[in-house]
């Protein structure tokens, strides 16, 4: 999206003709295929734009904080600046202003492919501009060139016990990659802070390039008897190399991986993994340490393990009710789940109030490629029934399915049945969004994050309540 388009969008949202966003100068898509060169041109302009904005509007109040917000996980509290994506309760995620369907149409595809290449989304997240095919090809080759793992990380991965969770292995390996950090080395040598973003960029590009190798190594060691991941092919895209290293050769699975890695990449800045990387990065920890911390957050059952919980529930449902199930029996099963104090996994979202567009695009993929798969048919049947049951129950603010209601079913269909591994794929994808933002956080000089905390007694005193 050009800056002038973004400005018009912002002005429309804010309802102000003279909104600072509306004053942005027009910017054409950059012709250079080198992402760092494009950033070098964009960053000074954005620094000036934000400086002027803060000078004029820095004291403006943008919201109120309630006691419930402080006890309720800061839900709805506006407290972060996060550039790469915005989550709208009704529309879902927008990557630099573009919806998922728009990205599917706009972003370059692999030869003969129909799904967007994650490389294109990364370019969009970093620059705000939809890339050309040449620019996406440059990213693919750049990541292939940077993909090799240092020997100590390979040795580390090969010596992990097989009962160590894949996410623990991923986090540990990413932390160990910090030995390669350009930023950590440059900071120790006293590099000028105006150069921070350049070193963060180099580390982020290196880390994204290496993640499929780390993830594939974990998969092969745990589930394929330690067989080799093979070599990176510089003529293939990032997702294609990843699926090859995992050991999957079905072109449809590669297309699914392109879609999966694109749609799981970013979801605004307040979720656990994005906020964690932002917080840790604000201490000037390098991208390896920041992203490793984010992965520890993603490993939590309330964040990245949800797709695994969906499959466990679906498998249990099939076991209890058998193959084809009538709508009436399915409805009774859902009510039994709710009445026992449990939730229906894959339904509801902290922000969204309509069907997650990430669910919708996966459903469209399934309708095209696996319409008769029994598990997909069950998911489609649930889509017709669960929202109505949840509305009848009256507790759910959002009765609609989220991304996790579908992704595991697709992976299972193509033979990836190792549910413990699914969050690793989520983590590889999430690197695109949080590292794109980390580059901008350092370019814009965001300070150490340090909100004020209060005790319950302090809150009671503030609002005039008696603590006794």
Swiss-Prot record:
It catalyses: oxaloacetate + acetyl-CoA + H2O = citrate + CoA + H(+). It is found in: Mitochondrion matrix. Keywords: Mitochondrion, Transferase, Transit peptide, Tricarboxylic acid cycle. Transmembrane segments: none annotated. Its main location: mitochondrion. Residues 1-30 form a transit peptide. CDD domains: ScCit1-2_like. Pathway: Carbohydrate metabolism; tricarboxylic acid cycle; isocitrate from oxaloacetate: step 1/2. GO terms for molecular function: citrate (Si)-synthase activity; identical protein binding. It is an enzyme of class 2 (transferase). GO terms for cellular component: mitochondrial matrix. One of its GO terms (biological process) is carbohydrate metabolic process. The active site is at residues 303, 349, 404. Oxaloacetate binds at residues 358, 430, 450. Homodimer. Belongs to the citrate synthase family. Key enzyme of the Krebs tricarboxylic acid cycle which catalyzes the synthesis of citrate from acetyl coenzyme A and oxaloacetate. Citrate synthase is found in nearly all cells capable of oxidative metabolism. This is Citrate synthase, mitochondrial. It comes from Xenopus tropicalis (Western clawed frog). The gene is cs.
